[in-house]
């Protein structure tokens, strides 16, 4: 009686069909030119992960409902990370292949999770990444202020690379803090390019049919009309910066609920906005936080002109270097030119401590005036137009 049942395709045929789809995405994204990646067989994956054994499960990374992460090793790598999707529904319209294609293009950059290879023989998509001693999901509440700033800079640098390193800009479009991993050194790494899209040459945007991402992080014209541009990522970075600064509880209190007091509306204070998990805030950190918040508001279009992602990354570097850490040195892996920044750093390092202190005082005074005006208008705006999620 089972004659009517649909016959399952052999694994080799499934892998062949998927390989053709992957090749199509590789050609579309990078003309077939990308960093070398390896095709793993199902047997190789099982052997590397002890057949997806419980002892190999990376609990720190496996809290979401989309993937399970496993540690492993093979003859070529002492440590690998294997990401296995729960079901193919996670990858809407074969976005698994887009993830592989874009990951292979950017895996040489320090702020992206490095892809080693993939396996097309399982029913669920499997990707293999370079492993380090420790990878863990970003929990902003556990991070000190200095680390939060560095995380924001890492992500802005990664997205600036996506926007500028290739003949056509690539837009990540579904950024959220859950797509960011930290390694043992606290370096932020972006992953999962399933919904990444490229902007055609000569164009500034592209329109998509499927809206992907977390609502709070989505620019209004993308959420309503499916318009994707570089500013889609800039908006998401601005929102991420606000989350890093305020923490989830404070952000929810400000954005989603009636404001606690009229005094808070008329005289907004940084210590009422900053995440209390960060503990005591110094004067230097207060100045940084104000500059950080103002930059985030530019990213989300609430203050001044929306910056490019390259400008966001540069400003985040400046906020850290000039107001806090005189020894900060730009990364050689950034796509933009840092010569001027390096020169400024050398000049500043040759000045006296008194001069630096004076500059900080002037900067703080300017930020105080600007901050008070901006915050009052920002809170009033959200009081009238609270977003419905």
Curated annotation (Swiss-Prot):
For this UniProt record, the keywords arranged alphabetically read as follows:
ATP-binding, Nucleotide-binding, Phosphoprotein, Plant defense, Receptor
State the similarity comment.
Answer: Belongs to the protein kinase superfamily. Ser/Thr protein kinase family.
Q: What is the lineage of its organism?
A: Eukaryota, Viridiplantae, Streptophyta, Embryophyta, Tracheophyta
- Give the modified residues of type Phosphotyrosine: 129, 222
* Inducing stimuli: Induced by elevated temperature (e.g. at 25 degrees Celsius).
Entry remark concerning the domains of this protein: The protein kinase domain is predicted to be catalytically inactive.
Gene3D superfamilies, sorted: Phosphorylase Kinase, domain 1, Transferase(Phosphotransferase) domain 1
Q: Which GO terms describe its biological process?
A: cell surface receptor signaling pathway; defense response; regulation of immune response; response to temperature stimulus
Question: What does the record say about the knockout?
Answer: Slightly shortened inflorescence stem when grown at 25 degrees Celsius. The double mutant zed1-6 zrk12-1 exhibits short inflorescence stem and autoimmunity symptoms when grown at 25 degrees Celsius.
> What range(s) does the Protein kinase domain occupy?
41-342
List-wise, which residues carry Phosphothreonine?
214
SMART domains with a match to the protein in the record = S_TKc
Identification of the protein by name: Inactive serine/threonine-protein kinase ZRK12
Mind telling me which residue stretches traverse the membrane in this protein?
none
């Amino acid at each position: 009686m089972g004659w009517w049942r649909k016959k399952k395709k052999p694994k080799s045929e499934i892998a062949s069909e998927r390989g053709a789809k992957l090749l199509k995405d590789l050609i579309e994204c990078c003309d077939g030119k990308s960093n070398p990646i390896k095709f793993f067989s199902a047997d190789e994956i099982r052997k590397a992960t002890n057949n997806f054994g419980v002892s190999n499960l990376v609990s720190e990374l496996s809290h979401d409902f989309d993937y399970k992460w496993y540690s492993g090793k093979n003859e070529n790598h002492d440590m690998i990370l294997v990401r296995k999707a729960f079901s193919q529904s996670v990858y809407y319209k074969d976005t698994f292949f887009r993830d592989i294609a874009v990951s292979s293009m950017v895996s040489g950059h320090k702020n992206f999770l490095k892809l080693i290879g993939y396996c097309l023989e399982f029913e669920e998509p499997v990707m293999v990444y370079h492993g380090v001693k420790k990878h863990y999901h970003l929990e902003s509440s556990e991070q000190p202020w200095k680390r939060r700033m560095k995380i924001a800079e890492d992500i802005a640098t990664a997205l600036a690379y996506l926007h500028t390193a290739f003949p056509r800009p690539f837009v990540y479009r579904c950024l959220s803090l859950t797509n960011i991993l930290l390694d043992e050194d606290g370096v932020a790494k972006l992953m999962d390019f399933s919904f990444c899209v490229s902007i055609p040459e000569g164009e500034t945007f592209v329109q998509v049919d499927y809206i992907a991402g977390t609502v709070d992080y989505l620019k209004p014209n993308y959420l309503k009309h499916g318009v994707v541009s570089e500013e889609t990522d800039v908006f998401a970075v601005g929102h991420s910066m606000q989350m890093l600064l305020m923490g989830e509880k404070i952000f929810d209190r400000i954005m989603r609920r009636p404001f606690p007091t009229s005094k808070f509306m008329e005289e907004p204070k940084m210590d009422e906005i900053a995440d209390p998990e960060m503990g005591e805030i110094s004067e230097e950190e207060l100045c940084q936080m104000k500059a950080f918040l103002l930059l985030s508001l530019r990213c989300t279009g609430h203050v001044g002109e929306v910056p490019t992602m390259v400008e966001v990354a540069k400003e985040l570097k400046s906020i850290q270097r000039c107001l806090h850490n005189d020894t900060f040195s730009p990364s050689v892996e950034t796509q933009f030119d840092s010569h001027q920044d390096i020169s400024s750093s050398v000049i500043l390092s040759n000045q006296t401590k008194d001069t630096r202190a004076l500059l900080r005082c002037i900067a703080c005074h300017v930020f105080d005036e600007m901050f008070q005006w901006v915050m009052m208008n920002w809170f009033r705006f959200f009081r009238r137009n609270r977003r419905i999620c």
